[in-house]
């Protein structure tokens, strides 16, 4: 497994792979890898000749400096996991390598609408940072496919739109959420939970599933469903942050023409902001 930290070396390797006619898959990450990331890697390996994993804690997508400062950096352990998975290339650049003149004056990519609604409304600049770094990685790695987790549902929708709008010739693969046995969606932020909070955490998925059951049973008073769910989260020990029920294909409000709904839940548990989602077919 090759570990590359600079743009010239990365470009050199990508040129070689292109000359050899290899099909390249990219898995963009911020490191602190867990089994959910490994599922992305496995999906990439099944679809390509060469797998490139990027590890970069992107300062442009953090709306709170304290979150950026405390985000776990575990490059050595991450590389050991990826080596066992037989990943071909790890791109782990420094912030200086990606943003040589800082982030304030760096050219950015913005996806109107999707970047400022829902999660974007409560995290200003977050999705602009995501679309900027992902487009830069696409430009550098020139992958045939790129794999993203469905846990970050809005992020995946944003990247699909960016790819369509910008004409990137890249297949975007959404990989289903990987869960612990008790239902908790795997996330790097789970590491912020205390042992006691970890016991409470699966309650998020239980509330999510309860909303899904109500929708499947034909209930359509969304305001009431959301209000009850928020109350249930707070009673379980969470601080409910945001609960949305949207059209899964547009992320707009549910309408009579909506065929699928996506339930998007965000809640604080101690210092961890946990997110999860579930898609429901509407009868």
From Swiss-Prot:
PANTHER family: CYTIDYLATE KINASE/PANTOATE-BETA-ALANINE LIGASE, PANTOATE--BETA-ALANINE LIGASE. (R)-pantoate binds at residues 61, 155. It is an enzyme of class 6 (ligase). InterPro entries: Cyt_trans-like, Pantoate_ligase, Pantoate_ligase_C, Rossmann-like_a/b/a_fold. ATP binds at residues 30-37, 149-152, 186-189. The active site is at residue 37. Belongs to the pantothenate synthetase family. The keyword Coiled coil does not apply. One of its GO terms (cellular component) is cytosol. Beta-alanine binds at residue 61. It catalyses: (R)-pantoate + beta-alanine + ATP = (R)-pantothenate + AMP + diphosphate + H(+). Keywords: ATP-binding, Cytoplasm, Ligase, Nucleotide-binding, Pantothenate biosynthesis. This is Pantothenate synthetase. Catalyzes the condensation of pantoate with beta-alanine in an ATP-dependent reaction via a pantoyl-adenylate intermediate. Pathway: Cofactor biosynthesis; (R)-pantothenate biosynthesis; (R)-pantothenate from (R)-pantoate and beta-alanine: step 1/1. It is found in: Cytoplasm. The reaction proceeds by a bi uni uni bi ping pong mechanism. Its main location: cytoplasm. It comes from the Bacteria. It comes from Escherichia coli (strain SMS-3-5 / SECEC). The lineage of its organism: Bacteria, Pseudomonadati, Pseudomonadota, Gammaproteobacteria, Enterobacterales. GO terms for biological process: pantothenate biosynthetic process. Homodimer. The gene is panC. One of its GO terms (molecular function) is pantoate-beta-alanine ligase activity. Its EC number is 6.3.2.1.
